[in-house]
């Protein structure tokens, strides 16, 4: 809330994002954006494109570019690198077994990084409704969310790392990806 704007974390999907009161900007990893939820109460690429064009125009008048703005944001808040991993399964019950196993016997490390904490999203967390999934925090500002897909026989894993640069984030994601897939398979 660096700019005195509230931040709200919700479950995946615009049915949850659109419920945020006075939403200024919402997005999900599946490339969906909302910038004018009063007009369009769902993801809306057209409004997002118009909004981005207005920002670019304003920056140009100041002699700046979108890249300049992004570099300023990354310098202030770090570069947030993200990746989604999908692990296909023969049947959904194997995901339930894995998640229940992690709940009963949490790991002390994943991909060589100490596990700082695990939030069981089946219990209400931070005002979120319960959902089947785990939010795992690793040393080094690394967040992993593991949940079953809502539409396919697969487990979805969302990784977020925060570093100083894009290259550092990509390197860290590369280091985590393989061991995480092996751990969860």
Region annotations inferred by a language model:
Residues 1-148, 154-158, 165-173, 177-185:
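Phosphate-binding and adjacent anionic-ligand microenvironments
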């Amino acid at each position: 809330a660096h700019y005195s704007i509230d931040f709200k974390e919700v479950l995946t999907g615009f049915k949850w994002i659109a419920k945020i009161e006075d939403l200024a900007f919402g997005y999900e990893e599946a490339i969906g954006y909302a910038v004018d939820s009063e007009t369009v109460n769902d993801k809306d690429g057209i409004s997002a494109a118009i909004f981005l064009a207005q920002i670019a125009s304003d920056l140009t008048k100041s002699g700046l570019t979108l890249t300049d703005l992004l570099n300023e944001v990354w310098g202030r808040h770090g570069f947030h690198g993200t990746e989604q991993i999908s692990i296909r399964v023969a049947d959904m019950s194997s995901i339930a077994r894995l998640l229940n196993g992690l709940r009963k016997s949490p790991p002390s490390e994943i991909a060589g990084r100490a596990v700082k904490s695990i939030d069981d999203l089946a219990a209400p967390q931070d005002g979120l409704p319960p959902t089947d999934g785990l939010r795992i925090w690793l040393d080094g500002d690394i967040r992993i969310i593991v949940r079953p897909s809502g539409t396919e026989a697969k487990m979805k894993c969302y990784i977020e790392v925060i570093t100083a640069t894009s290259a550092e984030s990509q390197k860290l994601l590369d280091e985590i990806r393989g061991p995480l897939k092996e751990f969860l398979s």
